[in-house]
Amino acid sequence: MSEAKDLIARAEKKAQPASGLMKWLTGGDSYRLEEASDLYVEAANLYRLSKELSAAGDTFWKAAECQVEAGNEDEAGNTFVEAYKCYKGANPERACEALERAIAIFTRKGQFRRGAYFKFELAEVQETDLQDYGRARENYELAGDWYMQDQALALSNKAYIKCADLNALDEKYLAAAELYRKIISNSVGNRLSQWSLRDYYLKLCLCFLAASDTVAAEKTLQEALQEDSSFHGSREHDLLAAIIEDVKQGDVEAFSNHVFEFDKFSKLDKWKTTVLLRVKTSITEVEDDLL
């Protein structure tokens, strides 16, 4: 890719500090750095066209650094995003670094809605590509907070759900429960969220059962009936009422039967299956302790 390398060589030369008469002739540092960034962007796009994504990401990064130095942070934020897009398929860790630079610029400029969008993307890369669930949880929650500040409740819920689900899978049940409560608060009274509410109540109660807190689970079930009249008689309500009693009685067989019957008509997803298995195991462990 000789053409891209030639452009980079010209950009590097442009980016060198000028002094004296040369500085006056070239229009000052800002103009010189802007020219360098344009050359880097042109080279980066050539790398992108030839599918040399790591090289494209590196070159977009250099362009963004020139833009920052020139005082053009708005443009730099966009260019760091372009670097992220290139790195995403080739170097996920570097992709996260580029996106963090972009987010820092957006939030410094007060663009929290945009920052939230990319915080969510950042968390997805950390969860899916890097399996860094700790950082993913933190960034999903921050995305949810920023969306909440912007009154984008549906988007806020989407981010909080991701964080809560990861918390529960990591056995941080009370942290997960706190977020599910927040999600429910955002959703009660919203006609579009009516069917989702049942799922949120189910997840919240399962977290309490997994934490061996049947009192909190029963209290949550009663609150659900008060907050959402349609919850009474739903399959989620009937399952919870049954398995809470099964846990209290230490009846593993009844618990398994109730879960099996529910799953026949409302297929349980991987998250619910995992948490329900943990609850079942906890009943068995209590039985063993009593023997």
From Swiss-Prot:
GO cellular component: cytosol; SNARE complex
Topology of the protein relative to the lipid bilayer: Peripheral membrane protein
Membrane in keyword set: yes
UniProtKB keywords: ER-Golgi transport, Membrane, Protein transport, Transport
Pfam families: SNAP
Chain's role: Required for vesicular transport between the endoplasmic reticulum and the Golgi apparatus.
Family of the protein in this entry: Belongs to the SNAP family.
Protein name: Vesicular-fusion protein SEC17
Source organism of this protein record: Eremothecium gossypii (strain ATCC 10895 / CBS 109.51 / FGSC 9923 / NRRL Y-1056) (Yeast)
Gene: SEC17
